[in-house]
Amino acid sequence: MTQFKEETMLVHPVLIPGSGTRSWTVLGDDDVPVVPVGRFLAYLTDIGRSPNTVKAYAHDMKDLWQFLGFRGLDWREARLEDIGEFVAWLQLPPAGRSGVVTVLTSSVPEVSAATVNRKLAAVSSFYAHQARNDEGPGDLLAAWRTGGRGGWKPFLHHVSRGKPYRGRAITLKAPKKLPRILTVAETQAVLDACTRLRDRFFFALMHETGCRAGEVLGLRHEDIAAAEQEITVMPRENANGARAKSGARTVPVAPELIRLYADYLHEEYGGIDSDYVFVNIWAEPKGQAWSYQAAYDLVLRLRARTGLDFDPHWLRHSAATRWLRDGVSIEVASKLLGHSSVTTTSAVYGHLTVEDARAALEKAGWLTGREVTW
């Protein structure tokens, strides 16, 4: 097997022949693509995985190929024990990965357990894909299990609870990170810091609907039904690269949001000829669909104005948390968020803060009155 040096391996964008769809590949020595990795990444693109997912998997496969190269291993000969060594290798600082420099073991790994698990998911998916094509050592990381997976259980779950499901043989225990949310006051501060209606509408839309930034950037005027007070998120190819991660869904909105949209069209959008809701108005090229970079630049300006080091995705987390706290069922919240499964919604948002616990106890009368005194 060719032993790739770290500096010679690159993740590089490519266009899929025929469709012209943008994807990613990994280049080895002399800018030669790593064929099995390229085929795997092209497959992910063909089945509709998001560009960000494909790019992340490309970096994960680059890490795997570097590790195999340093060990002198061919990917087809790798064993489960080798993947275990790969996990340990990932947690070394870059200077220690080549084996040329010996580094002291640190109590703080180079990458988090969550990041390692994501890379293992990519490796597992790669070997499963190769196994389906009768190549490689088989489904290397697969571990078939029975019993419950934990979390939310659907109606009639008991009917299939003994059915085996595919798990992963290696998974690091990672601390669960609660989603970051904005308080009502913080959300208001972000909105009030917007000096333009377009910018205010952008964040108000995320706050109201729980949509992802990419879904909002991809909105067309035809997706907003003003009379019905509904917004439809549609998966489609967009000129700005924005993408809806899930299938089509329709989200009801408040009349105030529709009025803000109308004000934006009347006072700022004017005669611009574009299908896109969010476009360049003051920057060139005027009328071009707003890009991720333009939205991120706005976030940086708002961080400076408000002193809040926030991320747009926090507005989505805030919407979901608000719905569940206000009694919206988890099934409805899951549909509004565009999750493929209620289990996903439960895993991400099925948490209680101290404030939630206090409110529940007060509602039950535990903190407002006592049957006994002490």
For the regions a protein language model found, what residue spans apply to each?
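Basic, Lys/Arg- and aromatic-enriched nucleic-acid-binding interface segment
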Residues: A174-A213, L217, I272
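Active-site/catalytic core of tyrosine-dependent DNA strand-transfer enzymes
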Residues: A254-G307
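C-terminal secondary-structure termini that scaffold catalytic or DNA-interacting sites
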Residues: M1-V11, A364-W374
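Short, charged phosphate-coordinating catalytic segments
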Residues: N133-P137, M206-Q229, E331
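Conserved tyrosine-mediated DNA breakage-rejoining catalytic core shared by Y-recombinases
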Residues: G214, G218-R259
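Short, polar N-cap/turn motifs at the start of nucleic acid-interacting alpha helices
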Residues: I224-A226, L308-D309, V328-V348
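Short basic/aromatic active-site micro-motif
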Residues: L308-G327
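N-terminal core-binding DNA-recognition domain of tyrosine recombinases/integrases
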Residues: V37-N52, K62-H157, A189
